[in-house]
Amino acid sequence: MIVVPLKEGENIEKALKKFKRKFEKTGVVKELRGRQAFEKPSVTKRKQTMRAIYVQHLQQVEE
Protein backbone atom coordinates (compact mmCIF):
# COMPACT_ATOMS: atom_id res chain seq x y z
CA MET A 1 0.00 0.00 0.00
CA ILE A 2 1.31 3.43 -0.93
CA VAL A 3 1.32 6.03 1.82
CA VAL A 4 1.85 9.73 1.11
CA PRO A 5 2.25 11.74 4.32
CA LEU A 6 0.76 15.23 4.11
CA LYS A 7 2.41 18.19 5.78
CA GLU A 8 0.40 20.89 7.47
CA GLY A 9 -1.13 23.13 4.79
CA GLU A 10 0.29 21.13 1.87
CA ASN A 11 -1.59 21.39 -1.39
CA ILE A 12 -3.66 18.36 -2.41
CA GLU A 13 -2.34 18.55 -5.98
CA LYS A 14 1.25 18.13 -4.74
CA ALA A 15 0.20 15.11 -2.72
CA LEU A 16 -1.47 13.61 -5.80
CA LYS A 17 1.71 14.15 -7.83
CA LYS A 18 3.74 12.37 -5.13
CA PHE A 19 1.25 9.51 -5.11
CA LYS A 20 1.35 9.17 -8.89
CA ARG A 21 5.18 9.13 -8.88
CA LYS A 22 5.31 6.47 -6.19
CA PHE A 23 2.68 4.42 -8.02
CA GLU A 24 4.63 4.60 -11.29
CA LYS A 25 7.82 3.50 -9.52
CA THR A 26 6.11 0.35 -8.25
CA GLY A 27 5.49 -0.72 -11.86
CA VAL A 28 2.05 -2.21 -11.21
CA VAL A 29 0.43 -0.87 -14.37
CA LYS A 30 3.39 -1.90 -16.52
CA GLU A 31 3.26 -5.42 -15.12
CA LEU A 32 -0.49 -5.70 -15.67
CA ARG A 33 -0.15 -4.61 -19.28
CA GLY A 34 2.64 -7.11 -19.78
CA ARG A 35 0.52 -9.95 -18.43
CA GLN A 36 -2.43 -9.28 -20.72
CA ALA A 37 -0.91 -11.52 -23.36
CA PHE A 38 1.78 -14.16 -22.93
CA GLU A 39 5.13 -13.28 -24.40
CA LYS A 40 7.74 -15.92 -25.07
CA PRO A 41 11.01 -15.50 -23.13
CA SER A 42 12.94 -15.28 -26.40
CA VAL A 43 10.78 -12.35 -27.54
CA THR A 44 11.26 -10.60 -24.19
CA LYS A 45 15.02 -11.07 -24.42
CA ARG A 46 15.05 -9.77 -28.00
CA LYS A 47 13.12 -6.66 -26.96
CA GLN A 48 15.55 -6.01 -24.12
CA THR A 49 18.57 -6.26 -26.41
CA MET A 50 16.96 -4.01 -29.03
CA ARG A 51 16.14 -1.44 -26.35
CA ALA A 52 19.71 -1.60 -25.00
CA ILE A 53 21.10 -1.03 -28.51
CA TYR A 54 18.73 1.90 -29.00
CA VAL A 55 19.68 3.53 -25.70
CA GLN A 56 23.37 3.00 -26.39
CA HIS A 57 22.95 4.61 -29.81
CA LEU A 58 21.19 7.62 -28.27
CA GLN A 59 24.02 8.06 -25.78
CA GLN A 60 26.63 7.93 -28.55
CA VAL A 61 24.76 10.51 -30.62
CA GLU A 62 24.48 12.75 -27.57
CA GLU A 63 28.27 12.83 -27.11
Swiss-Prot record:
Domain of life: Bacteria
The keyword Ribonucleoprotein is annotated on this UniProt entry: yes
Pfam families in UniProt: Ribosomal_S21
GO molecular function terms attached to this record: structural constituent of ribosome
Database matches in InterPro entries: Ribosomal_bS21 (IPR001911), Ribosomal_bS21_sf (IPR038380)
GO-annotated biological processes: translation
One Gene Ontology CC term in the entry: ribosome
Record field: transmembrane: none
Record-linked HAMAP family: Ribosomal_bS21 (MF_00358)
Protein name according to UniProt: Small ribosomal subunit protein bS21
